[in-house]
Amino acid sequence: MKTWVIKIGTSILRGTEETSTEEVIETLCRSFTSFLLKGNKLILVTSGAVGLGCQKLNIKTRPNDLSTLQATAAVGQVNLMSLYDKIFNKLGHNIAQILITKADFNSRESFNNASKTLKKLIDLNVIPIVNENDTVANEELKYGDNDTLSALVALAINANKLILLTDIENLYSKDPRKNKDAHPIKEVHNSELKEIKNKNNQNSNNEWGTGGISTKLISAEIATKGGVEVQLVDGTNKKNLIEIFNDNKIGTLFYPLEKPIGNKKSWLSHAIHTVGKITLDDGAFFAINKKGASLLAVGVKNVEGNFTVNQAVKIVNTDNKEVAKGLVSISSDNLRSILNNKDNNNSSIIVVHRDVLALS
């Protein structure tokens, strides 16, 4: 039995002049049914609420202000789920709506609760359909894209694979629409992702660098670090859906780490919202990065923000580059007090234990 998460992008759902959103969803759902009939499990992460809401309200262009985006999402989400429910019900499947914000994954308890609920739903042969709760999410606690959310969902349920359905055939070395020498990238190992992301960021002044590819690379990095294989596939081609369900290597495959960092470290790295920042010295950086040590007070150079025990902080080196995140064992006030009294016996106090410290 396989458990897959499939993310369906807006570019797929909006359809064409010849094909409506409902027809697109019906084609997708019929393909998904063939996968489910083999005894497999499926979770969908779907975009499209804002687009459908705009369509319903006769708004011609995507809104820029948050309140209008939230309003159109509220209207569109009803239509979106109605379409999925109507089509899947006709095919003999039950669905469940799951709306998530960053705040829902911010605590370990809520992350685990979401994980348990999703797992129970698929055990009951229900198809969970996940979307970001755009109606209540503010800018600070907003994913802004379902690529990142789909990776976190895949980690939460220990999925075998994450499928990113989009409107491009592969990841490319350059924007193929502007560069004739662009070549498709068929396979990517986790160790190569950082370089690919950097190259993409260098081209961020063009449409290719600022669009959906950037978030898909982030999604692939999150999932593969946690041990989940990722496949980027052109979902506008009906034949591709058959190919992926037969485990054929189409599109771009992102291979997971051979030794994944695990569910908890993945959550620490990508799901939590940090409330402070700790700068460490070179010795402490070497200790946590190369030796897997805990962060001790003696290695701390500076503290920013106010935090209490078990809150999340960003950990940076002397160049202010993020090197880790973790949950603190000491409040910011007590840590500052220790830093102001370096001669006392508290310099060996653990600030962030290695079990709750995740390298960036």
Curated annotation (Swiss-Prot):
Under Enzyme Commission nomenclature, its number is 2.7.2.11
**Binding positions (substrate):** 47, 134, 146
Q: Which GO terms describe its molecular function?
A: ATP binding; glutamate 5-kinase activity; RNA binding
Q: Where is the PUA domain?
A: 275-356
One CC-aspect GO term: cytosol
Could you name the domain of life of the organism this protein comes from? Bacteria
Reaction equations catalysed = L-glutamate + ATP = L-glutamyl 5-phosphate + ADP
Listed GO biological process terms: L-proline biosynthetic process
- Give the pathway annotation: Amino-acid biosynthesis; L-proline biosynthesis; L-glutamate 5-semialdehyde from L-glutamate: step 1/2
SUPFAM superfamilies hit by this protein: Carbamate kinase-like, PUA domain-like
Where located?
A: Cytoplasm
Keyword Endoplasmic reticulum in annotation = no
Q: Name one Pfam family in it.
A: PUA
Matching entries from InterPro entries are given as: AceGlu_kinase-like_sf (IPR036393), Asp/Glu/Uridylate_kinase (IPR001048), G5K_ProB (IPR041739), Glu/AcGlu_kinase (IPR001057), Glu_5kinase (IPR011529), Glu_5kinase/COase_Synthase (IPR005715), Glutamate_5-kinase_CS (IPR019797), PUA (IPR002478)
Ligand binding (ATP): 7, 166-167, 210-216
- What are the entry keywords? Amino-acid biosynthesis, ATP-binding, Cytoplasm, Kinase, Nucleotide-binding, Proline biosynthesis, Transferase
Q: What does this protein do?
A: Catalyzes the transfer of a phosphate group to glutamate to form L-glutamate 5-phosphate.
The entry sums up its family as follows:
Belongs to the glutamate 5-kinase family.
> What protein am I looking at?
Glutamate 5-kinase
The gene that this protein is the product of is proB
